[in-house]
Amino acid sequence: MQDSSFRIVDLSVESAKAKSYDNHPIATVNDHEVRISTMTEAYHWHCHPDSDESFLALEGGLFIDFDDRTVQLLPGQMITVNRGVRHRTRPIEG
């Protein structure tokens, strides 16, 4: 029986739900949404004017393109993109 004051999220189960590109919420922390994404293609260029965005690579890894450089994020690594910074994400394979 699970206590209603918490919810255990199994990230491997959540990521297995996706057969192609997928991005869906798995939790809410205060006023922030935690999402899990399976990337099979590049996401479009964009920025977030009012909030930072953090990425945590679980498996496979990803590239994060900025206007002046590209960063490679490997499994177990995390990065926070500051608000207002234009970026796009794309999988390492693809």
List the predicted regions and their residue ranges.
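A short, N-terminal "cap"/entry segment at the start of jelly-roll beta-barrel domains
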Residues: 1-35
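Conserved short histidine dyad/triad with adjacent acidic residue
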Residues: 19-20, 33-49
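Short strand-coil-strand connectors
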Residues: 30, 65-69
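A cytosolic small-molecule/anion-sensing beta-strand core signal
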Residues: 30, 58-59, 74-75
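Short, conserved beta-strand element in jelly-roll/cupin
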Residues: 38-39, 48-65
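Short beta-turn/strand-loop junction motif enriched in small, turn-promoting residues
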Residues: 41-44, 69, 84-86
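Short acidic-glycine-tyrosine-enriched beta hairpin
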Residues: 68-83
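Ligand-binding loop in jelly-roll beta-barrel domains
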Residues: 83-94
